[in-house]
């Protein structure tokens, strides 16, 4: 609740199914855009997989994880018809460097995730062009003080941004606080939501779990993520909201047109009350949620 735009994630599946899903998402987003604002806009596609490390695949099925290649990267880009914004992959897997070059040539953000990489491999990945880390602490080795993981590399290099699931389950509130004190506005709040009716998954203890009890994603809304962030890191609303607005816009290279209130930017706004609850949302100057939705439009 409160979102005016989102990036749709395509999870690891048979490769052709992933391409088809991405194509369908982009086409649906285009059709909705032509009809005028009716809700949050789909900004593009994020592929989470299939170029992942089996050791840290979590709920991504082993048989669908495949080697990376330049050719496969190009197929993913082509399927999105210009709408591929980001891909999460393990930088250490075979073919990752070749795939990454293709993604970067087409302006796709490369995010490291579901990876076994340690600090040195992480620094090499950043040197090659990785600029984001998918869900800090999850799907990667722990942040060991003697043998630091890839997370240490992304914390240290100020060119990067780190995605965080602030639901209190994926990452301890204490670690959320520590990460904020270290990274500040380089944190991007991510919901990591799973489809509510996806077969084989259920909500238990506030998170989405697979049949064997493995955490498979969150049941988190972005407004709750902001409230949690404020509480865990003991920060103001003005500080916390950056993680859900300007930081993600900056990550996908769209901060000149969204993610902040300024002349020339899109009138995509969410309205919050004094208890930090969502009262309504506006997309492209039109109220689409709350306040008698679709009855009010800003004058041009």
Where do the model's predicted regions map?
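Divalent metal-dependent hydrolysis catalytic cores, especially in the metallo-beta-lactamase
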Residues: 1-24, 39-53, 80-92, 108-111, ...
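Active-site core of metal-dependent hydrolases
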Residues: 74, 78-197
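Short, electropositive alpha-helical surface patch
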Residues: 19-34, 100-109, 241-250, 254
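His/Asp/Glu-enriched, well-ordered alpha-helical/loop segment
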Residues: 152-161, 180-265, 269-271
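C-terminal cap of metal-dependent C-N hydrolases
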Residues: 250, 260-300
